[in-house]
Regions:
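FAD-dinucleotide binding site
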Residues: 1-140
Length: 140
């Protein structure tokens, strides 16, 4: 029987980040246990055309705010990921219920700015996944 000192339950952002931090500190006696067949947890991006993988559509979280999420902003930068400001000018369309028609409303700007990752938030998961030893990750 194989024994391990550290078990990380879940391969979402928190689980992969925990494994990444262990790797950064030279700690290798760990496993990551994920019930699903894929990593990422609530973060998932759909890439409709593989030829344009940089244009993923986020199905979970879409934005981050490095202006107050300092650790996440630093992680994105340290992983060499490209980010861009969320488009905020013009009107927006809001659908409050499937029983009511969508309504056009004046847009607004976030302070601090909302940022997105090139390729969707899945790019963050993919970058962390590449830095975690494959043999330590066990998916369902």
């Amino acid at each position: 029987m194989h024994t391990t000192r550290i078990a990380i339950v879940g391969a979402g952002l928190a689980g992969l980040y925990a494994a990444y931090l262990l790797e950064q500190r030279g700690i290798t006696d760990y496993v990551v246990l994920e019930a699903r067949e894929r990593v990422g947890g609530r973060i998932a991006s759909l890439v409709p055309d593989e030829a344009r993988a940089s244009e993923g559509v986020d199905l979970g979280p879409s934005w981050f705010w490095p202006g107050f999420q300092f650790a996440l902003g630093a992680l994105v930068e340290s992983l060499g990921l490209s980010s861009f400001a969320q488009h905020e000018t013009g009107d927006m369309v809001v659908e409050r219920s499937h029983q009511m028609p969508p309504v056009r409303m004046q847009g607004f700007a976030n302070q601090p700015s909302s940022m997105r990752l090139q390729g969707g938030m899945q790019a963050l998961i993919d970058a962390l996944r590449l830095r975690v030893e494959f043999s330590r990750l066990h998916t369902g």
